[in-house]
Swiss-Prot record:
GO MF, one example: quinone binding
Chain's gene name: nuoN
Record's subunit section: NDH-1 is composed of 13 different subunits. Subunits NuoA, H, J, K, L, M, N constitute the membrane sector of the complex.
Main location: membrane
The enzyme's E.C. designation: 7.1.1.-
Topology in membrane: Multi-pass membrane protein
Family as reported in the entry's similarity comment: Belongs to the complex I subunit 2 family.
Protein name: NADH-quinone oxidoreductase subunit N
Pfam families found in the cross-reference section: Proton_antipo_M (PF00361)
Length: 485
């Protein structure tokens, strides 16, 4: 097989992040320096983002039988890189006074980013599986990075065991699909699964197992049990990555799979997805109502957000609006989550004990840090889907898609779930403006806004507001990022 310059350009983001992994590894071997390794990581991720401009100058192409680079892949590569950049930036201040080795953190983030980029380009079940494993394996180390704290270690072990079980389900499902169809590329599966062929028992079993594996990775009900514990136990910057990059990359490949291989034509699969979506929306929101830990609350709310996104998966036959809805919702969710977890990261440090994730830590924050409180308020409003924030645009798209596809039960569940969600997001907001307790158990650095993490949080808040008022520029970009069949 010959590699042409065009193919190399199409793979630029993947190659640049892969090269950054090697450079950071050599830098650690040569000399441990936290600042240098962070800088190398950030430069590598920024170069990968810039390289998307050159990728965009080319036609969509199959670089290899496993990888297809088009505008759709570019959009999600961009979102994954932004999430990874935010994670690396928050990690710098979080790790500043970390007593053990700091540099490996960035190495693990970069390897997981390579997995996310591969998933965004995957058009074959083999690259889907490799991408998911490349994304998941570094997370075992990242979740347990604060291993001196029992919660972090427990979360890592829990995630590792359950993730291994989910991966085995997924692999067995892929094997069953291969046994029946003889090919694993999405396009070939699309041809083979057409008409009555999709009702074969082996095909249905394979699809069922694939749904189990992917449902775990996306933390959908009933495969969600790890989510609150892992979000709570993981260091705050890792929770940012878990909530954003891993979900975005996996959902991107799932949408491509469902568009190219008409899986949603199976009535049984659509029914299963509808039940999972309604259960995720209601369970995620109801469980979040009673939480006093902000990371657990955001963990449960992420279950509900993925439930809302399943509306687009069930309505995938209307695929142009489906793809647009997913792009807009995930972009809004990305910026809102970066802001919310960023505030938690800024208030946390591994040498002070566990992260500042109790709601009590945020009580009266407004009276000490008014701008930080304003940022957190904007993020909660966006996650709740309140007008004038970008989160509202995403929620609006989901409801419009549900109505157009005549999915009345799902649309009703979105409305009910959003109403429940409003209550617990308001709880977080209200606690920020209550009278401050006399003994403040947490505080952020005085100059938080001039730190790199502070700037990322402020930019996220401004983007959420600006795109909430005038979302058209981003909508235009997302409309161009279509899957071309």
């Amino acid at each position: 097989m010959t590699i042409t310059p065009q193919q190399l350009i199409a793979l630029l983001p993947l190659l640049i992040v892969g090269l950054t992994v090697v450079v950071v590894m050599l830098s650690i071997a040569w000399r441990r320096d936290h600042f240098i390794n962070t800088t190398l990581t950030v430069i590598g991720l920024n170069l990968a983002l810039l390289s998307l401009y050159f990728v965009g100058q080319q036609e969509a192409m199959d670089v290899t039988p496993l990888v297809h680079v088009d505008r759709y892949a570019m959009l999600y590569i961009g979102l994954v890189l932004v999430a990874s950049l935010a994670t690396a930036t928050f990690a710098y201040s979080w790790l500043e006074n970390y007593p053990d080795n700091k540099e490996e953190f960035y190495l693990l983030v970069l390897i997981a980013t390579v997995g996310g980029i591969l998933l965004a380009c995957a058009n074959h079940l083999a690259s889907l599986f490799i991408g998911i494993e490349l994304l998941t394996l570094p997370l075992f180390g990242l979740i347990g990075y604060a291993y001196r704290q029992k919660r972090s270690l427990e979360a890592a072990i829990k995630y590792m065991l359950l993730s291994a079980a989910a991966s085995s389900f997924m692999l067995f499902g892929i094997a069953l699909l291969y046994a029946e169809s003889g090919d694993l590329s999405f396009a070939a599966l699309g041809h083979r699964l057409s008409d009555s062929y999709i009702y074969q028992p082996l095909i249905l079993s394979g699809l069922g197992m694939l749904v189990v594996g992917l449902g775990f990775k996306l933390s959908l009900v009933p495969f969600h049990l790890w989510t609150p514990d892992v979000y709570q136990g993981a260091p705050a910057p890792v929770s940012t990555f878990l909530a954003t990059a891993s979900k975005i990359a996996i959902f991107a490949v799932v949408i491509r799979l469902f568009v190219e291989a008409p899986m949603a034509d199976s009535e049984a699969l659509r029914t299963v997805l509808t039940v999972i979506a309604i259960a995720s929306m209601l369970f995620g929101n109801l469980m979040a109502l009673t939480q006093t830990n902000i990371k657990r609350l955001l963990g449960y709310s992420s279950i509900a957000h993925l439930g809302y996104l399943l509306v687009a998966l069930v309505a995938v036959q209307n695929h142009q609006l489906s793809e647009e809805t997913v792009g807009i919702y995930l972009a809004g969710y990305l910026f809102s989550s970066i802001g919310a977890f960023g505030v938690v990261s800024l208030m946390s440090s591994p040498y002070k004990g566990p992260d500042a994730d109790s709601l009590y830590s945020y009580r009266g924050l407004f009276w000490h840090k008014p701008i930080l409180s304003a940022v957190m308020t904007v993020m909660m409003l966006s996650l709740a889907g309140i007008p004038m924030t970008f989160g509202f645009i995403g929620k609006f798209y989901v409801i419009v898609l549900g109505v157009k596809a005549e999915l009345w039960w799902l649309t009703g569940a979105v409305v009910v779930g959003s109403a429940i969600g409003l209550y617990y997001y308001l709880r977080v907001m209200v606690s920020l403006y209550l009278p401050a307790p006399k003994a403040l158990n947490r505080d952020t650095p005085r100059n938080w806004a001039s730190t790199a993490g502070g700037m990322v949080v402020l930019i996220s808040a401004l983007l959420v507001l600006a795109l909430g008022i005038w979302p058209q520029p981003l909508i235009d970009v997302i409309q161009q990022a279509k899957i071309i069949l």
